Amino acid sequence: GAMARRRFIPIHDRGRVLIDLAVMLADGGESISDIGVLRHQSEALGPVASAPTVWRTLNEVTAGKRKKIQVARARTRRHVWSHLPGGVPASKCAGRDLGATIVLDVDATIVVTHSEKEHAAPTYKRTFGYHPIGVWCDNTTEFLAASLRPGNAGSNTAADHIDVLGQAIAQ
């Protein structure tokens, strides 16, 4: 797997820990400590790691491992899309079916923080926080890529858009 280390066999598989973290977020979790809620679902999910194990797992995610995770996500997406009845669903624009065209939706938003966090900055709306930019596949509503930017990042910064679109296309 993308998170494997030589000669290290953890009690909780690191890839599984990341999956549990994603499930926790989808379930409404807001902090790492919320991972404990999943333990009540152990019959369905299996053993769930503790919050310290989740932190250790996140600390192990290096740039090289992020690249491996991206490759695994892209491979999985291609596999799933190849098995969709009728192929990837068509997007519509102004009521017209776009056929087999894959539509990427790029959007940025302001995320307000209430204290100084790492890389947070004043926003153009006179708040304080972040200005992330994300890309979704409109056809399937899947999230593809994101870039966490400081609050003072420009809305129309071409370099940021090109970077995050490149990440999304690789998916």
Regions of interest found by a model, annotated:
Residues 1-154, 158-171:
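Dynamic "connector" segments at or just before major functional cores
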